[in-house]
Amino acid sequence: MAILGKAHSVSGVVIDEQTKEPLPGVYVTLINDSAKVLMSSTTNGNGWFSLKDVNVAEAFVGLGYMGYETQKIMVNIDGGDLDLGEIKLSPKSTMLGEVVVSADNVIEKADKYVLIPTLAELNRASETLNLLSEMKVKMPGLQVNEALKRVSVDGGGVVFQVNGKEESLSKVQSLNQHDILRIEYRNTPDIRYADRGVSGVINFIMKPRQEGGTIMVELDEAVTSLRSIATIAGTYYYKKSEWSINYGNTWQKNTKQYSDAQEQYIGRENIIYRNQIGQPSSMRDFSNNVSLGYTYMYDLNTMLAARLSFRAYDGNNRNYNIMEEIIGDAKSRYEKFNPNKSKSHSPTLDLYFRKNFSQTQSLELNAMGTISSGDYSREMHYKYDSGTDFNQINLTNNDSWAAALEALYSLKIGKVDTRYGVNYRRNHAENKYSENGAEFTPDRQTRDNLYFYGDLAGKWNKLGYTFSVGGKYFHNTGLSGSEHYLKFKALGTLNFKIDKHWSANYLYLYSPDMPPLSAMNDDVHTIDDISLQMGNLYIKPSTYQRHRLYVRYNTGNFYATGWGSYSRTDNSLNSVWYYDDNPSSKYYQMFINKTENGNYTDNISTQLDLSYQNLFNHLTLSASVGWDKYNVSDKAEYNSLNKVWASISANAYFGNWTVYANYTVAPRYSLDGRTFCRDIRFDYFGAKYRWKDFSFGARMVNAFTKRGFQQETETPSKVHPISKTFYIKDFANMVELNIVYRISFGKSYQRANRTLQNKGIDTGVNVEY
């Protein structure tokens, strides 16, 4: 191939052959006769692209876009700058129908939204989490809190993927946002992950990478408190291989955390009233996560990936409180000291193989193994004014392991995508318990979990649909006996495109859920001088059903989504309090907290999201308001709660500067068993400045507050009602500095999409009592 003495450019406009509309986000490459990519670009919002500094006389221009036939054009460039004019791409006849629902690069498919980040969105973002915060206006149900580094979909958890491979949030944050080709967003549970309780999937499809690599370093340092978060990531590509390393570190020490509580114990001759007055307490958290990854691609249709990761955690809490107790006419006051420690480490190995047999079928195989070892201590020390003391020390030693195998076959039949999968998982937890120096007593539990599933997604006229079914076989074996269940899951969605502005989406989910191993441990643990905690081997799986409907409206840069949902959990898993009034019982006159099946819990929710992007070309505004009603029915009592919640956020852009804010007007409530929980208030505002390969930022968290981080819970009960408020003053008016450094280097090389997942381990340990 001849080399030009003077560099030229190649440009053009890519349009849809049928509609004649420009296609934004088309991936454009310049390829030599050896199929090596020399340079690449993407079309802008008007479908235009330009390849600059071309110094070869002849080459091929390749164009690729999801849902369209790829195209390769031979070009001769020795005559000077070349304008290819309009280039027409033809939609694939075998692809699912799709509708561009706005001018902002959003494609609504049967089972997901496909979003193409604009150049402005990419330039404004300092990293991937910041990009999601800007683009959430186009992603119904997505919530982002940059200060907490928390992402949720429809109020639930998220599975992150990179080119279809499941990754951690820290890995996603290490991506160079300019290398993101598109984002595939699902705000419905994938049947593959439905047994994990997640509400959505966010998949980042990356541009073909260059031989060479990337390095990213990010530091979050609080200057008004002791809090530090660091991430170091690197990836290197060479020929058919990819090596990656990702290290994350979180260190935090609080010296001003408080826990207030009001409790009643009902059952004895006189009600026991306890008022807990929080005193300055301390907490130290130190966690380290490191992962090493390797990917080998035999060809574009065959690949093998491996990942070895290690997590270590060391936590220490020292809680001090003053207790006021009233029993009849008697009043007492005592000091309560409650230290606890947690230390654990866990290595994990993932292996993954994928083979694409054709454009319509593929096979994925995944094997995972992990082990966990940890030591946990929980102490309770009371010092009464009368001079008497109460001391309790609980120790737990844990050794656990888990292994999983999964196979997934994907097949396209005409215009319908289908998947068929099976997953087998074995989880073994072995815990040894000791109280007050007594000999350790063992507890062993093993759970076998066989999960098989299938789904299909298609489109009929304007109606997109997905239907999924799955079956789960549980077998749980412990020292006290064994239980087994066979349960089925079902998931269905309907997505109807009303017109160019309106669309409606309906979801139905039926999901049985097995309790965690810790809830099925019937060993008795001492909480304090008058109360105990135990699990229940014979609790049954709960059954969760949900109906959700939302209507979406979009015109220009304005987005509005109205939501309504109803869910019910039958045989709900609740922590129920009892008073033992049997004189012959071992636990006579003790209050016992035991895991039981309740009748049901109900949740009715409404929500309205309003957003406007690029107001005056500088400002993005978002607001959400909603109402939740919860009903909890146990065998002996009924409780309910209804609350209104609201939040607002804003991002403003001025050149290389970004100013942002997130504020909770009224916090949302959730339900955990029988406990009503007010969401954590963690508001912030800040600014970022981008300079070359750096981003510098500063933000204030929980500004103009005295308590800072605050969480409230309410547990109604006829035996032991509890009201708690936990807050960390260290996080009040907290100032954080952020630095991101990212650099990429190398030549271009095409990689295949892949999936690699690790679902963690259930240790069976519960120290939250």
Q: What is each PLM-predicted segment?
A:
Residues 287-314, 338-481, 485-491, 497, ...:
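Face-selective signature of the C-terminal outer-membrane beta-barrel domain
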Residues 15, 29, 64-68, 82-122, ...:
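Short, acidic, small-residue-rich periplasmic hinge/interaction motif at the N-terminus
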Residues 132-165:
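Extracytoplasmic beta-strand/coil segments of soluble accessory domains associated
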Residues 475, 500-545, 566-585, 704-720:
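Surface-exposed extracellular loop regions of Gram-negative outer-membrane beta-barrel proteins
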Residues 512-561, 568-570, 590-604, 725-733:
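Outer-membrane beta-barrel signature, preferentially recognizing the C-terminal barrel domain
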Residues 131, 165-190:
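Short acidic/polar hinge/loop motifs at secondary-structure boundaries
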Residues 83-88, 102, 128-133, 150-151, ...:
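N-terminal periplasmic accessory domains that precede
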Residues 33-48:
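Short, acidic Ser/Thr/Gly-rich low-complexity loop/linker segments typical of extracellular
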